[in-house]
Amino acid sequence: MEPVFLFLILAFPIASVYLLFYHKKRVVGLSAPPGPPGLPFIGNFHQLYKASSTHEYLWSLSKQYGSLVTLRMGSVPILVVSSPKMAKEVLQTQDLIYCSRPAMTGMQKLSYNGLDVAFSPYTDQWRHTRKFCTLELFTQKRAQLNFRPVREQEVSRMIARLSETAAASKDVNAYEWFSNLATCIISRVAFGKRYDEDGIGKERFQRMLSEIDAMFIGFFVSDFFPMFGWIDKLSGMRDRLDRTFKDLDMFYQELIDEHLKPNRLESPTEDLIDVMLKNEGSSLTKDSMKAILLNVFNGGTGTTATVLAWAMTALLRNQGVMKKAQEEIRSVIGKKGKVDEDDFPSLPYLRAVVKETMRLYPPAPVLVPRETMESSIIGEDKDHMYMVKPKTVVYISMWAIGRDPKTWKNPMEFVPERFLERPDINYKGQQFEYVPFGAGRRICAGINLGVTTVELALANLLYTFDWEPPAGMRFEDIDDETTNGLALQKKNALYIRPKKYMFP
């Protein structure tokens, strides 16, 4: 039985008893931000669970209650932030209070009890790990010497294979192609091995990525209702999590063992495992390395493929933008044959297309949850100040912020020109109307790797091919419906047909 349904069967009788005997005490002083009324014991659990789209539901709450909304999932208080001003308050002004992470069951287990950099609570260990990632793994020098050749080789390889598909007049599943590209780049960068389109290795790798996602978004009763934690065992979720962890740990260990072999052929460039093994010590154990690999795999593959799929969706739905982007790229590159990273400064419209894609279709519609470490006072103005308790989970809705008409003119339209008018807006978490990768202490450490891959791939896709919908389908038939989850996936797969562009 699904853990959610099993929990609900048991929870409602308890909620009824709770309602009979519970009398809310009067609280003196500042109150929590407003929000929809919940039920005793379960809070707003039933409302969130029945919502077909969590990010759409949170957006609707911001329209009704404002930029700060209070929810409760069982014993866990939740704060939803939906404006640039309040995002700045959380991500910058009071960052130290809001910079921890909730210790969610799935994330904690797969990150070796919080040894990673993305999901770990704010601890001394996290600070050491973050410093190592910033100063050793994702430096600008390493991006140029180690990452760039891999990116350019894998994008060229994808373009060559797509050219064969175009010659055969076949349709392609865009996300599958982009996912394969991202997987090949990340696997080569991380451990010097490509997991290709076919074969047992690729199947195993993709299966593990799928299980990681399932465990991250899966419902563990113990996260919200600790007294019912035993349901996780009864429902099978705990056993599934243990199996997933065991499989991942074995996979990581195999990779590390391969790198430790004395007769291993030396690669001309270091991969991330090489770098980590050279820095192994008290604050960087093998478990820490495995936890970092989790972040690289999970964050690097899905985000790149998702953004590329949404970029192509938006361009196909907006043919004028598509044509303008292609004209820019082809006029700059000419008959050189491909776009490389040195060409980026001459392609401002292309880069604006990527930014606009992540505004309208943010890779994470709700940023990875934060958790307050102490009480906080927050509000839009002095007449609307609220108290936020310690251990409150904080959701920052990029879906709502990117669609805010107070910030963006015609927010539902795909208009890359808005970023040409605001060249100061970047990915560094400095303008809080646009923070697709977060900001402050928790900003994504691998921004440059991900964004550069998207820009390089998209530029070459638009340079080399014209794009059409499948036979019998019109451009206006391409939808932008979304699924529910941590990442903003397309509900319906995007099938498109490449047609090789021939210069006159």
Swiss-Prot record:
Transmembrane portions of the chain: 1-21
Record-level GO BP terms: coumarin biosynthetic process
Region Substrate specificity: start-end pairs: 363-368
Annotated Gene Ontology cellular component terms: endoplasmic reticulum; membrane
UniProt-listed Enzyme Commission number(s): 1.14.14.-
Biological or metabolic pathway of the protein: Secondary metabolite biosynthesis
Similarity remark: Belongs to the cytochrome P450 family.
Name of this chain's protein: 6,7,8-trihydroxycoumarin synthase
Organism of this sequence: Pastinaca sativa
Lineage summary: Eukaryota, Viridiplantae, Streptophyta, Embryophyta, Tracheophyta
